[in-house]
Each structure stands twice: as C-alpha cells, then as structure tokens.
Amino acid sequence: MSKAKSEFNRRAIPEVARETHWIAPDGWRIRRIDWDLRDDSGAGATKPRGSLLFLPGRGDHYEKYLETLQHFADTGWRVTAIDWRGQGGSGRLLPDAHVGHIDDFSTWIADLGAFWVEWKSNNPAPHVIVAHSMGGHLAMRALVEEAVDPQAVALSAPMLGISTQGLPYAAHHAVARILGALGDPTRAAWKEGEKPMSPLNVRGKIL
C-alpha cells in the first residue's frame, strides 16, 4: 500500500475538495462536494481527463466514498458527488430524521436532471456518471427518460428491482398501496422493538 493511501483520513473532507449546496428549482438545498483541478487563480493547473458525477445509494452520504472519490480525482478527473434530497446532508422530508422517505422517485429524477444541466455546462467533457445501488437505478431511469446524457456510465451493484419471491410485481404494488392507506406510510418501517438491527446509537458508533 502506498504512503498516500495508508495516510488517507476517511473521517475528514480532503483539503482539496470543497463542500457547497446546489439549489434545486423548488428551492431545496442539495449538498455537493467537488474536486476542482484548477488552482486558486482559476487557471487550469492540470487539464482534467473529464468530469465525473458520483451518485450514492439509498440512505447513503458521500462521506462513505471519500477515498474512492479522491482516487478518481488523483487520476485526473474533475469529481462531483451529491447527497440525494432527504438524506445525507441534503435535509430531511419528515420530522423524524432517522426515517428515509420520498414521495416518488420522479422527485429524485427531477433533481438529477436539473443538476445535470448546470453541472455539465460548468465542467469539461467527457461527462461520466458513476453510481452505486439506488443511485444506479436512478442513473438508468434518468438515461431512459433522457434527463441526462453522459458519454459513459459505470454502475456498482445497481438496484434493478425488489425481490417479490415469485409473486407478480402488480400484487406487491397492490398490497403496498393498501397497507399505506391503512397505516402511516411516512413512519419508520420497523417500530423500535421490531427493528432487526442494532439500536441507532450503537449503529452510529460503527460509522
């Protein structure tokens, strides 16, 4: 392992990266991080290979991928990553900050499409998307809906669907709609005593 890799601090934002917010058309603040190869004067210190947009997964935040993103930057890419609306540093959609929620995936597609237009105009080609898990699903959907037009896409474990145990998707959709109507679709899927996982305070110490 190289000295640079062995000394990488996974718990700190690299000094060469900057965190800001992009304002969506409806005013929502989307957190972003950028590795810009230009020097302080704005001149191009190093001509980039191109521009890379990283899209994280469900419940993710870009801090989980800092070492990978730094690697992309070290190999010559101008790198940007975002936190999806409602997770990470992009606010919450419900009063309970520990409950993930979105009204419809189309909201995320709209955010991505609007962000893409601005990001693409401010960064040199080729424009590449790298996406993980749910980010991979949203990247594929955005491509199909022509919300983005990258020159290349790389997907890591993309969320292609949900296992239905052999039952038709339509049946699962119907059950989900019925349960949502009978209960509260915005509450946590598991009550505190039902969660098949460690308590939140214990999980926090692992990260």
Predicted regions and their residues:
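N-terminal cap/lid segment of alpha/beta-hydrolase-fold proteins
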Residues: 2-44
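Glycine-rich phosphate-binding loop signature in dinucleotide/nucleotide-binding domains
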Residues: 45-47, 119-125, 148
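Conserved alpha/beta-hydrolase
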Residues: 62, 69-95
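Alpha/beta-hydrolase active-site loop
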Residues: 100-120
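Alpha/beta-hydrolase-fold enzymes
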Residues: 138-207
